[in-house]
Regions:
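Intrinsically disordered, low-complexity polyampholyte segments enriched for Lys and acidic residues
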Residues: 5, 17, 27-30, 41
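Cysteine-centered motifs
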Residues: 10, 37-38
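Short, Gly/Pro- and small/polar-rich lid/capping loops
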Residues: 49-80, 85-90
Length: 236
């Protein structure tokens, strides 16, 4: 497993594959229960409106949960580390080619770390595998992910990632995990790299906030920009 000996976490993001994923974690993977409960309680305590999916129309049983966890760190040397982890856990005993995998035991537990400079260019990369379906084979691919070094997270990153590490050149799941790195890194460090504020708190009063026109909600001809960034409303 990758070592984590840096300063405390700067930002943490967790993506859960299904709203009922807590059931599997309670029954079979208590080691992550605390983190999940923190997320649920944060939403309630902070007053953030939770918007769950509609109630399922039929009873159902959980089969599989995939969890993606990304943590961003500020290093003492001025660089930034992004640690990403992906786990796959089944709710039933699975018979793999390599042998049985009991319910709640990770089928995949994979780690990917990149180090980026303030231009979001990757200057170091490492991968490690704690749980894999084919021990001795899947877990030999880690060194291949040094191919990420030199790529920039905001300049054709996903295209270049596919060219270097798709198919037999990499691990399907590590390469898929790498695809979340650009947006997770932007969430962590956007204010350090670009101007994201407006009005009296603007970093650069003449520069449009970075996030505008990057998604449907912040289109400059839309209501959100009219309300929160009126200076940048697109002129008809």
């Amino acid at each position: 497993m990758l070592r984590r000996n840096r300063r405390p976490v700067c930002y943490t993001f967790r993506v859960f594959a299904a709203p009922q994923v807590r059931l599997l974690f309670v029954e079979a993977a208590n080691s992550v229960l605390y983190a999940h409960c923190c997320l649920l309680n944060y939403g309630r305590a902070s007053g953030i409106g939770l918007m769950p999916l509609s109630t399922p129309v039929s009873r159902r049983a959980l089969r599989h949960s995939r969890v993606i966890d990304v943590q961003a760190y500020v290093r003492d040397d001025g660089l930034w580390d992004i640690d990403a982890r992906i786990t796959d856990i089944k709710s039933y005993d699975a018979m793999l080619a390599s042998g049985p995998r009991p319910a709640g035991t990770p089928l995949h537990d994979l780690h990917l770390r990149i180090t980026v400079d303030h231009a979001l260019t990757i200057v170091e990369a490492a991968a490690a595998s704690d749980s894999v379906p084919y021990p001795g084979f899947c877990d030999t691919i880690g060194p291949a992910y040094r191919a990420l070094i030199g790529l920039n997270l905001l300049k054709n990153f996903r295209r270049d990632l596919k060219q270097r590490l798709a198919g037999i050149a990499g691990c399907t799941h590590l390469t898929e995990l790498a695809q979340v790195l650009p947006t997770a890194t932007v969430q962590a460090f956007a204010g350090d790299v670009w101007s994201t504020r407006d009005g009296e708190n603007a970093d650069l009063s003449h520069e449009k906030p970075f996030q505008l026109d990057k998604c449907h909600a912040l289109r400059t001809d839309g209501g959100a920009v009219a309300q929160y960034y009126p200076r940048w409303v697109a002129k008809a």
